Amino acid sequence: MHEAQIRVAIAGAGGRMGRQLIQAAMAMEGVQLGAALEREGSSLLGSDAGELAGAGKSGVIVQSSLEAVKDDFDVFIDFTRPEGTLTHLAFCRQHGKGMVIGTTGFDDAGKQAIREASQEIAIVFAANFSVGVNVMLKLLEKAAKVMGDYSDIEIIEAHHRHKVDAPSGTALAMGEAIAGALDKDLKDCAVYSREGYTGERVPGTIGFATVRAGDIVGEHTAMFADIGERVEITHKASSRMTFANGALRSALWLKTKKNGLFDMRDVLGLDVL
């Protein structure tokens, strides 16, 4: 293998995101698809990962055992569900493998497990791996510092009918970026649902609204509304390949890291702007 390459393993190989990640790994220079995983009992076990993803023969067979492929990858990429990701995290921590985590919906204990593991292995953990979304998060911080103290802030997100968590991880990251810029904790100012007689809007809160419909890949808007004007900052994704390419870019970036917890803004160098 060329010195510049990094070998990746893809979790959830048969899922929508897993297939995109396989395609991206096979296409991206400097990346080698080393392993592809599916759950025990899946009808996809034994398939060629590249053919499964519609990218042509890869020579990588879909398996269910991480132990069987532990010598075939350097970085594990996981966009599955929290319980599965935490199992994979424990394995990677034990075997010194880097991780790129795009799974959302973790509770506080899950997030703490990721923080603890990052003391021993390098992890990029992000709610969204799109370059555009991460630029948007930086813009939200700037807007919040100028307008946040006097405007009503609302975050609206829309995703496909199959998404199982709400609000989306990206919407929560948007809220955290805004709250952080205002020296607040999102837990203290978030309003996640409104129904019935709610009374007037409480000043200083950050509202969230969620749409689940059709095949929407991902749309996010933050609204800063005052009397007579409002500013809206929006990102719309039209292809999951945007997220897949960002995840592979993160895996390449991790090549020089031994441990630590990072996000996509670190990968892109946005914190220096």
Curated annotation (Swiss-Prot):
Lineage: superkingdom: Bacteria
GO cellular component: cytosol
Quaternary data: Homotetramer.
Molecular function (Gene Ontology), one example: NADP binding
Function: Catalyzes the conversion of 4-hydroxy-tetrahydrodipicolinate (HTPA) to tetrahydrodipicolinate.
Subcellular location field: Cytoplasm
Binding locations of NAD(+): 12-17, 38, 102-104, 126-129
HAMAP family: DapB
Family, similarity comment: Belongs to the DapB family.
Protein name: 4-hydroxy-tetrahydrodipicolinate reductase
Pathway listed: Amino-acid biosynthesis; L-lysine biosynthesis via DAP pathway; (S)-tetrahydrodipicolinate from L-aspartate: step 4/4
One protein family per Pfam: DapB_N
Keyword Ribosomal protein: no
UniProt-annotated binding residues for (S)-2,3,4,5-tetrahydrodipicolinate: 160, 169-170
A single GO BP: diaminopimelate biosynthetic process
Active site: 159 (proton donor/acceptor), 163 (proton donor)
